[in-house]
Every structure is written in C-alpha cells, then in structure tokens.
Amino acid sequence: MFKHILVAVDGSDYSRRALQSSIELAAKFSSDVFVIHVDECDRGRTAAYALESPVEAKRLVADAIKTVRDSGIAATGEVCDVAPGHVAEAIVEAANDKHINLVVMGSRGLSDVRALFVGSVTHKVTQMAEVPVLVDR
C-alpha cells in the first residue's frame, strides 16, 4: 500500500515523532523511507545564505537516515534549498519526483511564529499533495 514513504524533518520534537511514525509504518508495510529537510535560503542583496548551516542540515538528514536504517528499513534522503516561503512546494515536488505513496510530517515545525502570518507548511502540504499526508502530533 505505502511502498515509498517521505518524512520531512526539521529538528523539532514534532518531526522526531513523525520520523518514528514513518519507521513504524515502513516496518508494517515493508516500505522504504525518503528523508527530506528543506532549508530556506534568504536571498540577500549580494548573496544567498541559508537560515541554518549546510553542515547542520546535512547532519539532520544523515542522523534521520541512520535512525531509519538502524531499524532495518531502507532509507535515503536529501537536503533541498529553497527560497523562503517555498518549503511546502519543495516537499510536494520531492514526493512527486520520488513516486512517494505517503508523506509523514509533524503538525508543527521550528518556524511556528512565521506560520501565524503565512500559513503552516504542513497545512500547505496537505492541500497540495496528490498522496495521503499523515500529520503526527
């Protein structure tokens, strides 16, 4: 049913719970897991800079992949850099490109204050995705 599961991680407690849920579902359905972290890059006047270091972003994905693999489940992942406000689009695009059957996300992330003004990434993904989205609380 869910052969390919995408889990979005951002280092929040909510995304850690989503990662655990993706592992449990992958074990139940003999699925593989694709871990994604979308890093927003602010485009300043002279250069683009990430809102977190590339090393931190890569470590976040690598740690999540290791957690999944340590559970005996095949896992891959990537860090995707996007302009601010385009995180949901990047997650949905990755889900389409990777032929994902289920997206798993936390109900909140690290950017909750900004979400009050522009809408949450999770809400946008649930509206845009062509596959089921499991929102873990």
PLM regions: where:
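Short, solvent-exposed amphipathic alpha-helices that sit
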Residues: S21, V55-T67, A90-V92
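Alpha-helix N-cap and loop-to-helix initiation/capping positions
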Residues: A48-E56, F117
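Short, acidic/small-residue loops that bind anionic groups at enzyme active sites
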Residues: K124, M128-R137
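Small/aliphatic-rich secondary-structure junction motif
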Residues: K3-L51, T67-T76
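Structural beta-alpha unit
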Residues: R69-V103
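Glycine-rich, Arg-bearing micro-motifs that act as flexible, cationic patches
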Residues: L102-Q127
